UniProtKB/Swiss-Prot annotation:
Active site, renumbered: C263 (nucleophile), H347, E349
Functional summary from the UniProt entry: Small subunit of the glutamine-dependent carbamoyl phosphate synthetase (CPSase). CPSase catalyzes the formation of carbamoyl phosphate from the ammonia moiety of glutamine, carbonate, and phosphate donated by ATP, constituting the first step of 2 biosynthetic pathways, one leading to arginine and/or urea and the other to pyrimidine nucleotides. The small subunit (glutamine amidotransferase) binds and cleaves glutamine to supply the large subunit with the substrate ammonia.
Positions of the Glutamine amidotransferase type-1 domain: 187-374
Binding partners and assembly: Composed of two chains; the small (or glutamine) chain promotes the hydrolysis of glutamine to ammonia, which is used by the large (or ammonia) chain to synthesize carbamoyl phosphate. Tetramer of heterodimers (alpha,beta)4.
Enzyme class: ligase
Pathway assigned to this chain's UniProt record: Amino-acid biosynthesis; L-arginine biosynthesis; carbamoyl phosphate from bicarbonate: step 1/1; Pyrimidine metabolism; UMP biosynthesis via de novo pathway; (S)-dihydroorotate from bicarbonate: step 1/3
Catalytic activity field: hydrogencarbonate + L-glutamine + 2 ATP + H2O = carbamoyl phosphate + L-glutamate + 2 ADP + phosphate + 2 H(+)
Pfam family, one: CPSase_sm_chain
Protein name stated in the entry: Carbamoyl phosphate synthase small chain
EC number: 6.3.5.5
Protein species of origin: Wigglesworthia glossinidia brevipalpis
SMART domains: CPSase_sm_chain
Amino acid sequence: MENILLNKALLILEDGTKFYGNSIGAKGTSIGEVIFNTSITGYQEIITDPSYFNQIVAFTYPHIGNIGIEINNNESSKIQVKAVILYQTHNIISDFRNKLSFSRFLLLNNIIGISGIDTRKLTRLIRKSGTQYGYVSSEGTNINFKEIKSKIKIFLEKKNLDLVKLVTTKRKIIYKKKYIEKNFFYNIVAYDFGIKFSIIKNLINLGCRITLVPATTKSKYVISLNPDGILLSNGPGNPEIYKYAIRNIQCLLETKIPIFGICLGHQLLAIANGAKILKMKFGHHGSNHPVKDLETNKIIITSQNHDFAIDKSTLSKNIIITHISMFDQTLQGIKLINKPVFSFQGHPESSPGPKDALFLFKNFINLVKDYRLNKK
């Protein structure tokens, strides 16, 4: 058991609501969008997911950190969130494989964590008022509240930043299984808008060689790589900001190359086809979201992490809706008519979450197989 010295900490929302707790991570202050996640497990995967970049994540489940941290379960190279808000954490690690506590993990990554917060009250407030920005401090609670509100206001004026450029790879990276023969893999180019490691692992397990490219990579270069398929990854932020990505996708749609979009990639694909995007009141963040597959009429339980949704009323005639949320009827999946192109709003790789949507990766590979066969 680790001995963690608890200092007083504070969360202030932009409407002035204050929550007092104890510091369990790094010392400092930060400002970010406060969202809540309803997952019971998978806290490590959540806070290392680049889709949460620049956000403050509040966990609704009361006990976080019970099994500690296993570094191999990270979804990126580091913690991506601005801060973590929770009710209670545990520094007694119950998994024999894990040697690092949740609190120590936050501290080593210089991330603020606050425990002792009434996360149910916080969640109800966000559900009622909508997502708010907040200020967190682990440097004590004796601060000037007027000054903090002013800082939040200044931050809000700059909130539409290009977050993708801050999380994308800076160079091309190749991922593949060792000892795989050249003619026995599918050549997939993945746009890194903030990709999770689990997406790469799932595609590799299906026989893919992944060429991960920066988010700003020109479509002409991607086509020159002679891909069998193109993946548009998950990532953070408002999709309408990423004009460069939308233009590249529009060019790629002029080819016959199969395209699969996930989360942010799903939204970008829709925008590239003329659709509009809506900012959700408090988003979908959790691993228990029921989604209806309109093609099979079955319900799948999915992992979700998004604050924007496609406006169904703006879809062009070449788009078919394939999935909808059973919580609020928001659009969850689309495919294009007469093109090997489709996308899904949730996370088929889960991590954390159920595996109900893994079949979408196989659907993508089936399109890739057909394309590869016909282009020879």
